[in-house]
């Protein structure tokens, strides 16, 4: 007798109450599988949304740099003034209660502007607590052109390392890599919340 026939015979021989329990168990397992799949789809959608958000913010920041570079090209400002004004503008643009901010490095991983790092600091050897070379990832992503990298970092004033989605773009004329990251710690919570609603 083949396995399918054996299962059919086993089910046929069960008392009606056990058949009902088996049916309810299978339905419950099916609902759980659907909920997990829905949560995963929701999670992936939220990640894509967050990636688009940070990419759009960096693109807007690149427009700011481009505007000041254009002023320098037209002679309205000298290049040093244009860079200072671009830095001041980008430093003032923060989101999510000042948690998400722009920073600028150069391709040699030296800080041009960062709210928590000294200008000129070499960051190529900087590692997150998880052992990730953060600035190497950022520089490689910007030079590849896709711009995305992921690492862990604490939120300002906290110690816990949280997942971060980061987008970087290289402004070649000035040799600047503009970067912004958003924390992704709430994405999984939102996705599971979707299944409870």
Locate each region found by the language model:
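Extracytoplasmic/periplasmic sensor domains and loops in membrane signaling proteins
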Residues: 80-87, 117-156
């Amino acid at each position: 007798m083949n396995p399918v026939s054996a299962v059919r015979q086993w089910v046929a021989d069960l008392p009606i109450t056990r058949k009902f329990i088996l049916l309810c168990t299978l339905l419950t397992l099916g609902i759980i599988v659907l909920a997990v799949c829905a949560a995963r789809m929701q999670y992936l959608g939220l990640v894509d949304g967050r990636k688009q958000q940070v990419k759009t913010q960096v693109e807007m920041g690149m427009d700011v740099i481009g505007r000041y570079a254009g002023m320098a090209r037209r002679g309205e400002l000298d290049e040093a003034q244009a860079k200072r004004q671009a830095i001041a503008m980008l430093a003032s643009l923060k989101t999510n209660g000042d948690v998400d901010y722009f920073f600028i490095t150069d391709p040699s991983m030296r800080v041009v502007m960062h709210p928590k790092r000294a200008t000129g600091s070499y960051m190529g050897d900087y590692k997150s607590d998880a052992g990730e070379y953060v600035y190497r990832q950022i520089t490689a992503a910007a030079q590849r052109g896709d711009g995305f990298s992921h690492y862990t970092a604490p939120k300002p004033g906290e110690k816990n390392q949280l997942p971060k989605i980061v987008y970087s773009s290289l402004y070649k004329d000035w040799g600047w890599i503009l970067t912004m990251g958003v924390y992704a710690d709430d994405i999984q919570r939102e996705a599971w919340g979707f299944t409870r609603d």
